[in-house]
């Protein structure tokens, strides 16, 4: 951003590649219909929409590559042929790309039931429309150090009430706060999982990511 607050560029350190190479698979979720961005997504899948001359998903792949993640899987459904045609096997982008094709929409976690890893490493999942400066390496390290089954990246979100908020005790007013600001945490659309957790998913059954986390917690997997 320049001194006049004009947006100039997004920098993801694409040109600064680490010497450390990670074998961990990364699944990029790119199968959604992008309904909220219609009509832009009528003839183009949302992950291929350009930001500063490159598709959103290409920014993600470049960020991953710069951190040494080159074992990439892309989950596709809507207009999947366009994504396959653009990236191919990933050779032109300096990575290896395999595809997980959803024959029907499986939600934000259902495609993991069709994921066949090419190693036994923990894997990262990232939504295909996320522009982020998060360190995937640090997230993976955090996940490993805590010996977690599943890790979700979150971000702080501040929300201002549009009205005065009243707290009561029965019919008595305890306090009044005029349009207070509350801090919460929201899902950032990036996760790390133990490789074996995909076994609890039923093949080709639709499931959303929040429900998947509830399932993991319930089973204490």
Give the ranges of each region predicted by the language model:
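Short beta->alpha transition motifs characteristic of CBS
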Residues: 2, 6-20
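Conserved N-terminal catalytic core of the sugar/cofactor nucleotidyltransferase
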Residues: 3, 54-127, 138, 203-204
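A conserved hydrophobic position in a structured secondary element of the catalytic/binding core
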Residues: 11, 78, 126, 168, ...
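N-terminal glycine-rich phosphate-binding loop and ensuing alpha1 helix
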Residues: 18-81
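Active-site metal-binding loops of divalent metal-dependent hydrolases
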Residues: 33, 128-130
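A structural signal for short hydrophobic beta-strand segments in well-ordered beta-sheet cores
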Residues: 48, 165-168, 213
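Catalytic-core segments of class I nucleotidyltransferases/pyrophosphorylases
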Residues: 123-124, 131, 137-144, 157-159, ...
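A short, conserved acidic/glycine-rich loop-to-beta-strand motif
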Residues: 146-156
């Amino acid at each position: 951003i320049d001194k006049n607050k004009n947006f100039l560029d997004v920098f993801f350190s694409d040109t600064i590649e680490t010497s450390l190479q990670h074998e961990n698979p990364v699944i990029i979720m790119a199968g959604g219909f992008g309904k909220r961005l219609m009509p832009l997504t009528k003839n183009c899948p949302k992950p291929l929409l350009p930001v500063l001359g490159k598709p959103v998903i290409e920014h993600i792949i470049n960020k991953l590559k710069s951190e040494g993640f080159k074992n990439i899987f892309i989950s596709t459904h809507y207009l999947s042929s366009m994504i396959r045609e653009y990236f191919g096997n990933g050779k032109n982008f300096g990575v290896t790309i395999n595809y997980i094709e959803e024959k029907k929409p499986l939600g934000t976690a259902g495609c993991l039931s069709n994921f066949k890893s090419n190693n036994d490493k923990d894997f990262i999942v990232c939504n295909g429309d996320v522009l982020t400066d998060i360190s995937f390496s640090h997230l993976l390290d955090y996940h490993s150090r805590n010996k977690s089954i599943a890790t979700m990246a979150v971000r702080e979100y501040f929300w201002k009430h549009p009205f005065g908020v009243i707290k009561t005790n029965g019919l008595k007013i305890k306090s009044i706060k005029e349009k207070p600001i509350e801090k919460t945490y929201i899902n950032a659309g990036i996760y790390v999982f133990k490789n074996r957790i995909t076994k609890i998913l039923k093949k080709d059954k639709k499931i959303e990511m929040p429900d998947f986390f509830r399932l993991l917690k319930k089973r204490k997997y």
